[in-house]
């Protein structure tokens, strides 16, 4: 579904819908600024679509490099966010990408 709802502390109200309906997407949020970034998701073999919420409507922004679903996300959604992991067809990915309000860039993560 592309439906978006906002919670005011006691009830939900439908607001501007996503441009691309999806499930299994990742997101990052900056609550004081009412901004949100949503990326990836399904149906099909995953999507790279990314949209930004400004408190009123969704806008298409730079897409992920790797289409996927069931992806993790973190960040403030105003200036930067990361998308990590997720499912691809077939299998899973460990790809990590950083969004900087202009584009997604693939990052290499080293663990020890």
Regions flagged by a language model, labelled:
Residues 1-112:
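Polar, enzyme-active/binding microenvironments
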């Amino acid at each position: 579904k592309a439906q978006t709802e906002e919670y005011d502390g006691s009830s939900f109200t439908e607001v501007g819908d996503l441009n691309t309906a999806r499930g299994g997407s990742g997101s990052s949020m900056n609550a004081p600024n009412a901004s949100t970034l949503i990326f990836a998701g399904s149906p099909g073999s995953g999507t790279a679509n990314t949209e930004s919420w400004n408190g009123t409507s969704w806008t298409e922004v730079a897409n992920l490099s790797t289409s996927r679903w069931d992806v993790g996300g973190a960040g403030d959604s105003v200036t930067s966010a990361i998308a990590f992991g997720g499912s691809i067809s077939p299998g899973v990915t460990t790809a990590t990408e950083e969004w900087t309000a202009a584009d997604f860039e693939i990052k290499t993560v080293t663990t020890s």
